[in-house]
Structures are given as C-alpha cells and as structure tokens.
Amino acid sequence: GLYQMKPETPFITGMEAAGTVETVGPGVSQFKPGDRVVAMVDHGAYAEKVSAPATRVFALPDTMPFDDACALMCAWGTAHHALRQRARLQSGETLLVLGGAGSTGLAAISIGKAIGARVIAVASSDTKRAACLESGADVALPYEDLRDALKRETGGRGVDVAFDPVGGAAFEVAARAMARTGRLLVVGFASGEIPKLAANLVLLKESSVVGVFWGNFVNTEPELYAENNRELFDWHTRSVIRTRIDESRP
C-alpha cells in the first residue's frame, strides 16, 4: 500500500488498546496494577494482552468506556494534531473536511466545531453526508461540482483550512478553494492516488501546504501528545465531542 508505516510481515494489527494495568516495568511510578488506561502501540493491539512504553499509556477518566478511549487515539489524535498544531485553526475560521464520513474526517468535524470553526464537510453519498451533519458539520457537500459549491458557501472568499485525508482529484479543488493565507493539510491518501500540486496556486493565494504525520509527532513530542490527549479526554467528559462507534465486539 501507500501508507508510510510498513512493519515486516507477519504482524498483529491494531494500534489502540484499553483496559486495566496488569504489571508495570522498573522505574514506572505513574501507573499501578488495576489502573484504567488506554495505550498506543505501533501494531499488536488486537491481542489479549499488550505491552506498551509508559510514554504511550494514558490514565482514563472513570466515566470513559474503553471503546470510546480506543476511538479517541489514532483517528481523533491525528485530526486534533492536524487542526491544533499544524493548522492552528482558530474560532470563527472556515474548515473544509474532505472524506468527511471517514474516521479522521468525522473527528475533524467534531474537533473543528469544538474549536469554534464553521465546518464544510464533503462526502460521496447521502448516507455519509448525513453522518457528517450528525457529527456537527454546518454544511455537507457532494464531490460533484465541488469547486462551485465551495465558492457559493464561502461567498467567494475560500476556506481558511482544508483537511485532506483523501488525496486524488479533490486535492486540487481544495488547493483552489483556499482563502488568502489558508492552510491545506496533507493528512493521507485514502483514494489511493498521491496528488501533484501546481505550485502557482500556493503563490497566488499565499497559502501553505502542511504535512501531517501524527505517528512522527507522537514519537518526537510526547509531552505535547499527552497534552493533546488531555484536551480530548476533557472534551469527551464534558460531552463537547462524541465518538461514533459502529459496532463493538467482546
């Protein structure tokens, strides 16, 4: 595939694990057996037991279910880092979310609203657009005639931030829809197509194209990563955000 992390096969999949601590390693004082925690690992979470570095383990609020905790890790962590650190999204700005009904897209919609942005989501079907609206999007658009629709929805001004986990043809539409000094976030390539960018669009709009590699952020800025998680947990506890879980299995 095109994803940048490629562990050697065979390997156990899964990045998020939540449960109670069984044992702690030497020098670990912030956790003890019985604590409710969630952990992030590079892979191997789909197992009965998981070992994780203490810097990747986080204490859970008593009211947070384990499945919600897992949901908040990768997809929500990616969207939060993208909008908080990479885009520096501000209240009152307009946020465009491509792939709005995907896991990171739905997270970006909710986080954008929590920050105070106006959110325009894009998704490929009526059902998916309904999911975007349920997650808080102010507007949900199809990909067809997207360029004209964005002009209409922004009064010709464009969007301040575009969140793109899809790539492909929609990337250029987003690049053309940027407001002056807008920030176009390169989050992923779910379409399977890594797009090319006409650099003159960046020049003319004085916009920025900003990469988002959450896995690298987690490894290089663990203290800020922990701070991000605290904000997500606080929002969840206060019902500012709500995860969307399709199905849970024992």
Where are these regions (language model features)?
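Adenosine-nucleotide cofactor-binding segment
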Residues: 97, 113-173, 221-227
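Short glycine-centered segments of the SAM/dcSAM-binding site in methyltransferase folds
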Residues: 36, 94, 118, 182-183, ...
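A glycine-rich, Thr/Ser-enriched phosphate-binding loop motif common to dinucleotide/cofactor-binding enzymes
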Residues: 63-85, 99-101
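Glycine-rich NAD(P) Rossmann-fold beta1-alpha1 loop
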Residues: 76-77, 99-106, 164-168
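A structural motif shared across PLP-dependent enzymes of the aminotransferase-like
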Residues: 41-54
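Glycine-rich phosphate-binding loop and adjacent beta-alpha segment
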Residues: 123, 169-241
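Short helix-loop-beta connector
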Residues: 32, 62-67, 88-94, 156-157
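Glycine-rich beta-strand-centered segment in the early N-terminal region that forms part
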Residues: 2-44
